[in-house]
Amino acid sequence: MSGPSQDSEPEAKVLHIKRLYRAVVETVHKLDIIISGKSSYREVFKPENISLRNKLRELCVKLMFLHPVDYGRKAEELLWRKVYYEVIQVIKTNKKHIHSRSALECAYRTHLIAGVGFFQHLLLYIQSHYQLELQDCIDWTHVTDPLIGRKKPVSATSKEMEWAQMACHRCLVYLGDLARYQNELAGVEAEQLAERFYHQALSVAPHVGMPFNQLGTLAGSKFYNVEATYYYLRCIQSETPFDGAYGNLKRLFDKASKMYHQVKKQEMKKLSPSRQRSKDIKRLLVSFMYLQSLLQPKNSLMETELTSLCQSVLEDFNLVLFYLPLPAHGSQSASEEEEEHDSVGSVLPDSLIFKMVVICLMVVHSLKRGASKQYSASIAFTLALFSHLVNHVNIRLQAELEEGESDVPALRTDNTDDADARDHSSAALSEERTLQNGSLEEDDDEEEEEKENGEDEPKGNGRTVATKKNQEKKRSAEEKQKQKRKFSRLSMLRRRRCAHKEDESDLSEGFESDEEEEEEEEGGGGGLVDGLGAPRVQMNSLGRDTRKGPLPEDGGWESGSEEDEGGTAFDVETDSDMNSQESRSDLEDMEDAENAPQQPQQEENEQPQTSREENATPPVTNGPSVSNDASISSNLQAMSSQLFQAKRCFRLAPTFSNVLLRPATTTPPAPESNPAPVQEITPPTGETPRNTSPEIANGTNDKDPDSNSEGSEHSNHSFHSEKTLSERLEILTNQGLIQVVKVFLDWLRTNTDIILMCAQSSQSLWNRLSVLLNLLPEGSKILETDIGLNKDVTELLSECEHPSLAQTLLLPEDMALRHLPALSIAHRRLDFTSQRPPLTPLDECVVRVCCIRSFGHFLTNLQGNVLHFNPEAGIFTSISQSEQDNLVQQAKAQFRMAEEEARRNRLMRDMAQLRLQLEVSQLEGSLQQPKAQSSMSPYLVPDTAVLCQHLGLLRQLAASGCFIIIIPRTVIDGLDMLKKENSGARDGIRFLETEFRKGNRYIRCQKESGRSFERDKLKRQDTEAWHLYKMVDSCRQLTGSQSSGDEDTAGMVTILTGHSLEELSERSASMKAAVQAVAAAGMELKNIIEFYRQWKEMG
């Protein structure tokens, strides 16, 4: 005990504390006896037991204020556990006995409400007693008496003040828990309230990870556990983590593994477009969760399997980002009712994308800290994911900036009653916002004002109710129509993946992944938890989530299989055992009765596997803190080269089903300097606009992270009118993914070693980033326009073009990621404790623009030649110096001819398109240089002798990436016949099996199609000649002679043999005729040794 002196008063106080503590122990013992009984759920709400709990509550309150340092925490714990939590657990454990509208249910509801009232009162009393200043942190603040005009003197010690601060934090956690338990009851919507309490607890004590664990429990199985994973990782990486989060996260990863293998096993099934969207999003989220579970520090996996999974997730991520919100319909036919709920899960919200990217950053940080061998793979995947994200930001911004330039029909052809659609309060205002938020809102008559504000809008936008209502009043009817045209323009970008077959080529730009049948699920609906949920009182956190609504049985967001008790009082069941005071993970452990099935072979992995030639990188001075920097750099470049691969310009044979697809209709005339893109894909069936411009198709041309066509350049559009600066800033303000870009660039700025190691292998990322930088307005132009910016923002604008910009203004995304270890260096200059000036959404947007453009100049100063900046034209480029000089000259000529301000946007797009044209020409040259074109064929067809005797040479040809090796069925049959007596045949079979399993795009097995002459008599007389004839038939399929094409196919295919040509011709007349048939079919027959020597001589 502590006391200032040993006089009689402290002695009396000590005796009083002892008596209180003894009374508390006795009361707790009586309550424990009640709780341990078999029918405790009936006993807990009897009047005498309620009185006993009330007595314990009074004793605990007295004890904690008499001696807060020694007894405060213990009294809090006993009060929460014995008075509230254990009663709640008894009821939840026996919920099958608690029927709806029964006396027990009524008593339970009253118990929860009484707990909320008590802790709110306790929170206010602690603030008042210790004069705490929490106005910027929480809603329930103590208001000083205005008549006094000054604070009361506080005689508490520093330790007592510390306890008071943390007691307020814990009260907020308890309030969040009580709201979460209320949310599980039928007819109660308290999820947003619980989330708000948890965020306020974080604002009071941001270093404590407990509220993150509670947010993860609150999220439940929404978005297939991705959201919960984000919160558990945040809890684990907090300064004071909660031990229970480790078990909770492990349980989610175990679920992810099971769900991933279930998804892979499900049969393919044709679905409606909206259900297909839900299935694609489910596949993405489940695969993403499984990948993150494999990237944990203690896990180990084969590199090829990990690479295959990374590529699959990237394909799905790129596909799902093309899904934009469907327009709201005023009326709905009966046939559409089945798909009504699917729209809820048909879009990936921006807040979820934010969480996914931050999960990647947290995993990279933990792998680096643990010196894990998965570190390189994690970085390569994260950069590739961000590359896709930047590309889609470019596409969306470009579509907004070019709104009205071309007539694009609406995606859906349903007859929509526009008048009814306009009756929705958010129809006119939030169509543009739904792009940012990523999901459509559901109507709720009880909260009309929140419906108008876009509940799922991230906090980063900071829009208030009043601001939105004023904007809505100011909008004219013409502007409403303008918004609708804009939405149809954006909705055109949606597409679905094309169907694929076993013999489909890797070389098309389309997407491919297994389609699986959506499993039927039951679960309570839940609002979307905002990933940017910074605990700031001034923000309308209650109005940023998607309102809870009925979720689809097939393709919904919920992945859990919680059962709804038919007649019980509980609506949903969550893992509420993961509560604030206990690590109850042992109570929730799900014993796996069977081992997880092995992951199916990735036979259809369509991603390329190129040779891993390491690029020379500048010396890294700030490398990862692992044992072998050179090994990390090598592995990172190799992994990046696989995830960021350059497309090759091959003309695909008709044998492969996914031949190059071209736009179905006319194309707007393009400038002479901007030829049509090399490869394009059409939108999917069921969502195909009538007029698909090549620019839009080109934007979707992105199967792997390194697409030549960035999709956001539309330089061949002539502008009828340029967007004003205010309109451009409004578009940027409404683009929610800009926040994710800003956060990721903050991380990259503090990890220059990663930038330098991936400078060459991640060229696609820098290309897309340069396009985004050119779309953002310059700081000087914003300063010249009077748009009513904050004074501090104006000062920041003056340094916008400096590479060493020091951000001092806090953004919502910075607050949301406060104390995140991965961003600790980036946030070292930010003051999270001082009073922040209020920033409007426009101010926040301008700050993001400053940070992103400053990062662009930061890249131009790096020694790896990542980006270049042309001061006169004011544009960024990401090409070699010689190409840059050429582009700069053209830019200057066009810049002088154009009007400086009105033509600025078009110039930037022209420059970007020229850069892409040069890249395409470079890639075309890899196969179409004069020397190579004259004597080298793109398709090589080896015979059995090559695979048995010259497998090493064939490996080198395949690894070069210059040829596609086609293995006909007849060659495989020949190897099968020789495998018993020929070891070379067995080696060849093993080699082919390995390459097919990896999905090597340069070694393909050809499936026979079309009519083939069997020559059964010849097969008996001369087997080798018969095999050669069969190979000629296979090659005819490659050259397209069975199709109606008019192209010259001479020299397209070379048959490689392990025998000398003279020897073959002298063997028999049948063999000689077969050799002549090769030449007659326009093919070449060469000895592999001679072919290899000739190829080496030509370089």
UniProtKB/Swiss-Prot annotation:
Residues 403-631, 663-722 are annotated as: Disordered. Residues 440-455, 504-523, 560-576 have a biased composition (Acidic residues). Keywords: Cytoplasm, Nonsense-mediated mRNA decay, Nucleus. Disruption phenotype: Morpholino knockdown leads to phenotypes ranging in severity from weak to severe that are developmentally delayed with disturbed brain patterning, necrosis in areas of the brain, aberrant eye development, impaired somitogenesis resulting in stacked somites, perturbed yolk sac extension and posterior axis extension with a high mortality rate of 88% at 5 days post-fertilization. Residues 938-1061 form the PINc domain. GO terms for molecular function: telomerase RNA binding; telomeric DNA binding. InterPro entries: DNA/RNA-bd_Est1-type, Est1-like_N, Est1/Ebs1-like, PIN_dom, TPR-like_helical_dom_sf. It is found in: Cytoplasm; Nucleus. Residues 419-434, 469-481, 701-722 have a biased composition (Basic and acidic residues). GO terms for biological process: chordate embryonic development; nuclear-transcribed mRNA catabolic process, nonsense-mediated decay. Residues 482-499 have a biased composition (Basic residues). It comes from the Eukaryota. GO terms for cellular component: cytoplasm; telomerase holoenzyme complex. Residues 618-631, 688-700 have a biased composition (Polar residues). Plays a role in nonsense-mediated mRNA decay. Does not have RNase activity by itself. Promotes dephosphorylation of UPF1. Together with SMG7 is thought to provide a link to the mRNA degradation machinery involving exonucleolytic pathways, and to serve as an adapter for UPF1 to protein phosphatase 2A (PP2A), thereby triggering UPF1 dephosphorylation. Necessary for TERT activity. Required for normal embryonic development. This is Nonsense-mediated mRNA decay factor SMG5.
